[in-house]
């Protein structure tokens, strides 16, 4: 049996590329297409790349498409796709991104890449890091995980006594200086896998005088040796310094054996004789005697150094030894012959000695070849250290065994975390196709994905197959390319016939109808072979009857459907996004909802142009999980927004003092950076006064009827009770009870704290108006009424999930202010305030007459409400907006925090929230120059963003508890007129390009009017020779001589299976069609 050796087969290895990063962050890889044992020869395919299959260029998918409009979602160039493309990963791509981090030096020290981060020592954030603090290969990381651990010193190191340092070293303790965690983390919205890590060591200066160096060369040799010495004159007489990690103490007898190594060119370097000329070379006998005498007299040890050839021009071995005497003559000589123990040194002629000298040459301009470290002399000892740690220092011809040196290696020779100066880490992530991605065909038909529908909602074929993509039919005449229609229909035929086609360009050379005839013939063959009659209909070729996936009804018109080759382009959605980050919240009728949880069914708070607050359903919501770009961050005490640069902000000029909403306008964030602008936090709530009716209850089989409440009194009572009241079922003893009005005893008790005088005064006035009697009990007012108790019990104090009732949102703006001010009264401190004056005034006058005056006098700056209920805190912020003011939410005390009160420690069982009510200053300004409390910056960002579109284009949003009005997330620029083409190409604000005017004309006027315009006015403008329009005006017979562009348009419309033709009436007024092919 013949083997590879008998056949003289030489194995050839090919290195395949696996998941390499491209310049556009895509992945490049090779996939083998052959197996071991297969026979291949020159020209055979061995592997495919990421963009090929079977050796052919392949970057897309053959999918089922249809040219039809669908609810406006594929308007203009928009594309509607099925969720099958997402779930089946037909357009899922792998992207590789590089993240790097480096260490820098600050005034307090040098940053360090390490795993030892004290602040995270007791957490699980460091589990996936290796000993150097770098994420391990293959680790799956998500948003916020550490890629590379790094610490930055924030204060200078303190000097520690030596005995303290010794004590800490013995016990293994480390002194923790002030450091900051500056680790590199995974950006927002990213979940990826670590596939490659590159570390770079620190680059230390290898010589003190890096600029002044000289080179050592040998002219007689075919190679050259380059190392560096100081150029200063004072250093010329110093010993040549070379360093090596590998050094061995050896005697002179060991050194003498070097002469007998085979093929080892030798250099002997002595001291103090580099520039001296060798005049009298010793004779054979004297030389022998001198050398052996030196050998016998010496008992000291010498150093032997050896460096394997690193570069192609380096010699194999370099030897150096230092003579035992301080003033030994130095000689350079080279001998290429092989010596043995018997052979003595030969006397060299002057020419030979001159040629074999290694001379030192000083060059002003030289190129750096290699660096061999700096001089290190200690007590007359010289060592040699190369700057290439991976270089082997032992050659095969050396008598030193490599294993002897390998035993001396330890962990210190390898890369330590303290030596790492920078790290490049590569993450691989999968990106599925999403809304906003750009797709294109092979004929210039590109577009943006606008919606992803469930496959059951997509239109489907007569056999039940749902389509994968819906394209706008108006994109065909605008592209001026009929090839996409032919490809679509031919793909449908090839799918059912199992065939592939290669169409030669310019196939019209075979006939004027070559493409059309070939496509129709293949469709007919598919119909005959499969028995599916719907594949080809002679009366309407190329069109199919499709059914609506939502209703099952058939569409009125037949639709062009087939298979086409569609490509997903590089992700370009980032530049067209008008979005906010996920940490924003939106105000709805359901309360404050995170931006990523808002649905089109929610009613979002929006602002009209006149400043009126209304609630509307969002028209659309967009989510882009892989946004990568810059964000605009603006923050001060009343404002906090983090948006994309294209997001429109609702602002006005800072110099305008008026509070009218007319002056506000929507401006992109990138256009207001650094400018003095004012934002808006308030709105006008246009509601009629609301009348509250207390629901009826059943008590002891008796129905207590509904009760209509006095609204002014009820709002103040309810506002105080929601802050300081609770419902009890205990029976209160008669002790410590003072009867204010006699009332029947009842176990259903409503109790309100009256520790503050102003609260007591208000309750004394409003409770009798409401028709209740009350008692005093331990600094509390108690009301015994089952009907009131039953309604107020779910809203009792101490319930962490309580919220305002629904009827509150039907209050008018004045009523909302009364309720809000009553709630804040409980937390208002001070005496003789405007509130107390208003309360005392209301005790003397009727509440209805004092009510407007009460609102005017209660304007105060420091108004706050405190609660442990998150829902209630959000409701109060919304109530402030209904009142024409605004509210900022702050987390005052976190759950579990400890506070001291009267010498006792109190542990918070819930989060304590403070809502700051702002009544007057609701136009926060930025970049006004008065103080530097605000912050404005443009930050790099990668992660998820959300886009919200509302009809009024302005909605209410908050971040970190600070609410403000902001602009619509997505906008379309002004539309250009149909008959107007912008100069200098495409307009930046939505203008059409040449060829798109016909599309708009067809859509607006209809095909007949458009053809009339093109046939008359346009044709005259283009050619300047036709007189059709004059003939129409003067009612003369028309002469058909249309331009070539009109013929192209007619052909494309016919390719869409539209019945296009020119008809002429004969003498009998019978229309007869004119052959288009004979025109022009």
UniProtKB/Swiss-Prot annotation:
- What SUPFAM superfamilies has UniProt attached to this entry? beta and beta-prime subunits of DNA dependent RNA-polymerase, Hedgehog/intein (Hint) domain
Q: Name one Pfam family in it.
A: RNA_pol_Rpb2_6
EC code = 2.7.7.6
Enzyme class name: transferase
Q: Which Gene3D superfamilies match?
A: 2.40.50.100, 2.40.50.150, DNA-directed RNA polymerase, subunit 2, domain 6, Hedgehog/Intein (Hint) domain, Homing endonucleases, RNA polymerase alpha subunit dimerisation domain
- Asked if the record carries the keyword Chloroplast, the reply is yes
Record's keyword terms, sorted: Chloroplast, DNA-directed RNA polymerase, Nucleotidyltransferase, Plastid, Transcription, Transferase
Signal peptide annotation: none
Catalytic activity reads: RNA(n) + a ribonucleoside 5'-triphosphate = RNA(n+1) + diphosphate
Q: Which GO terms describe its cellular component?
A: chloroplast; DNA-directed RNA polymerase complex; mitochondrion
Where's it found, cell-wise? Plastid, Chloroplast
Q: Which GO terms describe its biological process?
A: DNA-templated transcription
User: Which terms does the record give in the GO molecular function aspect?
Assistant: DNA binding; DNA-directed RNA polymerase activity; ribonucleoside binding
Q: Which family does it belong to?
A: Belongs to the RNA polymerase beta chain family.
Summarize subunit and interaction data from the UniProt record for this chain. In plastids the minimal PEP RNA polymerase catalytic core is composed of four subunits: alpha, beta, beta', and beta''. When a (nuclear-encoded) sigma factor is associated with the core the holoenzyme is formed, which can initiate transcription.
Give the function comment from the record.
DNA-dependent RNA polymerase catalyzes the transcription of DNA into RNA using the four ribonucleoside triphosphates as substrates.
What more is known?
In S.helveticum the gene for this protein is split in two.
Q: What is this protein called?
A: DNA-directed RNA polymerase subunit beta C-terminal section
Gene for this chain:
rpoB2
């Amino acid at each position: 049996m013949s083997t590879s050796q008998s056949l003289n087969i030489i194995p050839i290895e090919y290195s395949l590329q696996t998941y390499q990063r491209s310049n556009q962050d895509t992945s490049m890889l090779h996939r083998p297409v052959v197996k071991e044992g297969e026979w291949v020869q020159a020209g055979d395919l061995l592997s495919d790349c990421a963009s090929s299959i079977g050796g052919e260029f392949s970057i897309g998918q053959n999918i089922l498409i249809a040219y039809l409009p669908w609810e406006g979602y594929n308007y203009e160039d928009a594309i509607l796709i099925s969720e099958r493309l997402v779930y089946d990963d037909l357009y899922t791509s792998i992207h590789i991104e590089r993240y790097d981090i480096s260490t820098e030096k600050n005034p307090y020290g040098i940053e360090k890449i390490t795993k030892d981060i004290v602040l995270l020592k007791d957490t699980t954030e460091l589990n996936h890091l290796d000993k150097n603090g770098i994420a391990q290969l293959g680790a799956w990381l998500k948003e916020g995980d550490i890629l590379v651990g790094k610490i930055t010193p924030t204060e200078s190191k303190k000097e520690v006594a030596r005995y303290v340092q010794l004590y800490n070293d013995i016990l293994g303790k480390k002194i923790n200086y002030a450091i900051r965690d500056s680790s590199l983390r995974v950006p927002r919205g990213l979940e990826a896998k670590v596939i490659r890590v590159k570390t770079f060591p620190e680059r230390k200066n290898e010589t003190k005088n890096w600029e002044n160096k000289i080179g050592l060369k040998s002219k007689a040799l075919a190679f050259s040796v380059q190392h560096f010495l100081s150029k200063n004159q004072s250093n010329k007489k110093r010993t040549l310094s070379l360093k090596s990690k590998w050094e061995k103490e050896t005697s002179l007898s060991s050194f003498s054996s070097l002469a007998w190594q085979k093929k080892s060119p030798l250099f002997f370097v002595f001291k103090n004789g580099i520039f001296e000329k060798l005049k009298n070379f010793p004779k054979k006998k004297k030389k022998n005697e001198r050398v052996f005498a030196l050998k016998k007299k010496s008992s000291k040890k010498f150093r032997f150094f050896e460096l394997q050839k690193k570069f192609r021009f380096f010699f194999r071995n370099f030897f150096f030894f230092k003579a035992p005497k301080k003033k030994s003559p130095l000689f350079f000589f080279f001998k290429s012959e092989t010596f043995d123990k018997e052979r003595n040194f030969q006397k060299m002629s002057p020419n030979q000695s001159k040629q074999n000298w290694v001379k030192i040459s000083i060059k002003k301009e030289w190129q750096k070849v290699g660096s061999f470290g700096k001089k290190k002399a200690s007590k007359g000892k010289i060592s040699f250290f190369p700057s290439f740690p991976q270089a082997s220092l032992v050659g095969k011809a050396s008598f030193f065994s490599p294993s002897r040196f390998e035993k001396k290696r330890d962990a210190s020779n390898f890369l330590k975390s303290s030596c790492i100066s920078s790290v490049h880490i590569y993450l691989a992530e999968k990106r599925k196709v999403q809304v906003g991605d750009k797709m294109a065909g092979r004929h210039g038909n590109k577009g943006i994905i606008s919606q992803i529908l469930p496959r059951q909602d997509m239109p489907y074929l007569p056999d039940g197959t749902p389509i994968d993509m819906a394209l706008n039919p108006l994109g065909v005449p605008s592209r001026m390319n009929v090839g996409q229609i032919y490809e679509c229909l031919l793909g449908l035929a090839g799918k059912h016939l199992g065939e592939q086609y290669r169409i030669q360009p310019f196939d019209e050379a075979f006939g004027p109808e070559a493409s059309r005839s070939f496509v129709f013939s293949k469709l007919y063959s598919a119909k005959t072979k499969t028995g599916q009659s719907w594949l080809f209909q002679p009366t309407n070729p190329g069109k199919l009857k499709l059914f609506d996936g939502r209703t099952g009804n058939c569409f009125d018109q037949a639709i062009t459907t087939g298979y086409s080759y569609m490509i997903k382009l590089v992700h370009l959605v980032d530049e067209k996004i008008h979005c906010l980050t996920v940490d924003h919240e939106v105000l709805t009728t359901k309360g404050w909802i995170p931006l990523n949880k808002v649905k089109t069914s929610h009613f979002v708070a929006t602002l009209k142009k006149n400043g009126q607050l209304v609630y509307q359903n969002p028209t659309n919501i967009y989510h882009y999980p892989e946004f990568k770009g810059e964000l605009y961050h603006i923050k001060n005490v009343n404002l906090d927004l983090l948006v994309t640069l294209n997001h429109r902000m609702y602002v006005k000029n800072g110099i305008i003092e008026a509070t009218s909403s007319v002056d506000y306008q929507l401006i992109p964030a990138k256009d207001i950076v650094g400018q003095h602008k004012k934002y808006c936090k308030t709105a006008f709530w246009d509601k009629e006064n609301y009348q509250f009716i207390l629901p009826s209850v059943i008590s002891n089989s008796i129905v207590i009827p509904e009760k209509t409440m006095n609204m002014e009194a009820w709002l103040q009572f309810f506002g105080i009770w929601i802050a300081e009241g609770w419902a009890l079922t205990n029976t209160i003893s008669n002790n410590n009870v003072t009867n204010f009005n006699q009332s029947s005893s009842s176990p259903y008790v409503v109790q309100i704290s009256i520790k503050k005088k102003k609260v007591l005064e208000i309750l004394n006035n409003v409770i009798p108006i409401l028709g209740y009697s009350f008692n005093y009990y331990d600094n509390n007012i108690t009301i015994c009424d089952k009907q009131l108790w039953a309604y107020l019990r779910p809203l009792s104090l101490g319930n962490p999930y309580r919220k305002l009732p629904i009827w509150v949102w039907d209050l008018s703006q004045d009523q909302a202010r009364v309720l809000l001010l009553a709630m804040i009264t409980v937390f208002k401190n001070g005496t003789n305030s405007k509130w107390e004056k208003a309360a005392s005034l209301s005790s003397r006058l009727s509440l209805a007459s004092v009510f407007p005056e009460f609102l005017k006098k209660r304007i105060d700056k420091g108004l706050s409400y405190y609660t442990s209920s998150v829902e209630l805190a959000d409701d109060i912020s919304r109530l402030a907006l209904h009142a024409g003011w605004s509210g900022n939410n702050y987390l005052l005390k976190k759950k579990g925090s400890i506070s001291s009160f009267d010498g006792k420690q109190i542990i918070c069982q819930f989060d304590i929230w403070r809502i700051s009510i702002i009544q007057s200053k609701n136009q926060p300004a930025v970049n006004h120059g008065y103080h530097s409390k605000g912050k404005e910056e443009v930050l790099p960002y990668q992660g998820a963003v959300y886009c919200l579109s509302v009809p009024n284009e302005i909605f209410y949003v908050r971040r970190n508890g600070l609410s403000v009005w902001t602009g619509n997330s997505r906008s379309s620029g002004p539309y250009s007129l149909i008959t107007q083409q912008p100069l200098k190409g495409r307009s930046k604000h939505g203008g059409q390009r040449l060829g798109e005017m016909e599309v708009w004309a067809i859509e607006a006027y209809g095909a007949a009017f458009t053809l009339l315009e093109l046939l008359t006015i346009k044709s005259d403008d283009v050619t300047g020779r036709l007189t059709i329009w004059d003939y129409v005006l003067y009612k003369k017979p028309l002469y058909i001589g249309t331009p070539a562009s009109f013929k192209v348009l007619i052909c494309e419309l016919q390719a869409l299976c539209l019945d296009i033709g020119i008809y002429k009436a004969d003498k009998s007024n019978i229309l007869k069609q004119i052959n288009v092919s004979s025109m022009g």
